[in-house]
């Protein structure tokens, strides 16, 4: 079980994250190649990695140069850009989750629908590069779980496309809902919206580092050079002790007996889009012998209030209950394997270093079935036969 622990003692930003992943050993070509798979004019930006130091700590610095004149981009445009690219499914999924959390926060702050969220022209390219680069690097490393230290709040003001705003910026503050913070770091912006979105979307645990054997350390430098502490984020990569990974989640439940069942499927889709780890309906019999369903949502602890509010907004429920739970999980990662139908994404499940089973990835098989006008069952059989060997 491969774990990545983000030591954010000075904060986190998108470029710091990519830089730390590169310092951890991810080839620069992995990040550059992923960005090149997006429909962005290659002449409109350039990427580079440099060696630098902050307060005597050697670190990598990820530099993105962007032309000033860029087209207006809304969240819907960026989401379509990622989905229609040739990126691996695992990279797409991570990037979409991060951008959704970022756009959701911006939508709430500015009071607009999420599809109409507008990213500042130059900042949009920066965010796209940082988010897709992070997703590609994590996929290349085969990270199973991301954990992070509590985040420094920072203080003061920051200059943005919307003017001078308090630290943390409003979108960052929204993304910090449910995440642990502290005020020990000094003044200035310590957590950027992109950095907060990465952890809000991907981190499954916050606090002390989980028990693991460290196999790599990476340091990523931020743009600024703070007076008080080195502006560096450290990443610790390691193997969890034993074959199982333990993490903490929140279970959200409610009973529904008076709602049009046609809407229930939409509710599940909204929950998964919002970052729920899982969601399901189960049948039950309620008072007055009413047939009903129980909605169960598995969420990261920091998502509790957000997802509970979504349930109350999207269903006829007038209350929810929630409680913490612990999980034990097997390691799983996505791989592309060759088949007679072309490269297909499969899920490889491991117990420690031993492969337990290999299962076809539903979305990849569904796409092949549609493209080749085959039944999904037939595609599954072929993939299981040709790519399902451990």
Swiss-Prot record:
Pfam family, one: Ni_insertion
Disulfide bonds: none
A GO molecular-function descriptor: nickel cation binding
Keywords: Nickel
Keyword Cytoplasm: no
Keyword presence, Nucleus: no
Domain of life: Bacteria
Family: Belongs to the LarC family.
Name assigned to this protein: Putative nickel insertion protein
């Amino acid at each position: 079980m491969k774990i990545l622990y983000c030591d954010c003692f000075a904060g986190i930003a998108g470029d710091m994250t990519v830089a730390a992943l590169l310092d951890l050993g991810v080839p620069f070509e992995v990040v550059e190649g992923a960005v090149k798979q997006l429909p962005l004019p290659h002449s409109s930006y350039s990427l580079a990695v440099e060696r630098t130091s902050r307060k005597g700590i050697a670190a990598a610095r990820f530099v993105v140069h962007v032309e000033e004149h860029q087209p207006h981009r809304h969240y819907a445009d960026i989401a379509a850009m990622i989905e229609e690219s040739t990126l691996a499914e695992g990279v797409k999924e991570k990037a979409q989750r991060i951008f959704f959390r970022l756009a959701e926060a911006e939508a709430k702050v500015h009071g607009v629908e999420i599809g109409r969220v507008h990213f500042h022209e130059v900042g949009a390219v920066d965010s796209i590069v940082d988010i897709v680069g992070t997703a590609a690097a994590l996929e290349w490393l085969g990270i199973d779980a991301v954990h992070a230290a509590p985040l420094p709040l920072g203080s003061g003001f920051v200059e943005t496309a919307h003017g001078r705003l308090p630290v943390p910026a409003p979108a960052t503050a929204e993304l910090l809902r449910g995440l642990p913070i502290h005020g020990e770091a000094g003044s200035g912006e310590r957590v950027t919206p992109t950095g907060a979105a990465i952890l809000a979307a991907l981190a499954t645990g916050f606090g002390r580092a989980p028990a693991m054997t460290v196999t790599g350390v990476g340091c990523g430098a931020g743009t600024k050079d703070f007076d008080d502490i080195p502006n560096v984020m450290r990443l610790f990569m390691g193997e969890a002790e034993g074959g199982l990974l333990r993490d903490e989640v929140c279970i959200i439940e409610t009973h529904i007996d008076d709602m049009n069942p046609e809407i229930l499927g939409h509710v599940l889709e909204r929950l998964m889009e919002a970052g729920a780890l899982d969601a399901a309906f189960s049948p039950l019999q309620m008072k007055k012998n009413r047939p009903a369903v129980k909605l169960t949502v598995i969420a990261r602890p920091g998502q509790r209030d957000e997802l509970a509010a979504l349930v109350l907004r999207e269903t006829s429920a007038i209350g929810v209950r929630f409680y913490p739970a612990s999980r034990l999980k097997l390691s799983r990662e996505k791989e592309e394997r060759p088949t007679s139908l072309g490269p297909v994404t499969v899920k490889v499940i491991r117990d420690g270093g031993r492969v337990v089973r290999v299962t076809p990835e539903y979305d990849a098989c569904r796409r092949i079935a549609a493209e080749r006008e085959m039944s999904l069952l037939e595609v599954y059989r072929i993939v299981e036969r040709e790519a399902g060997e451990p």
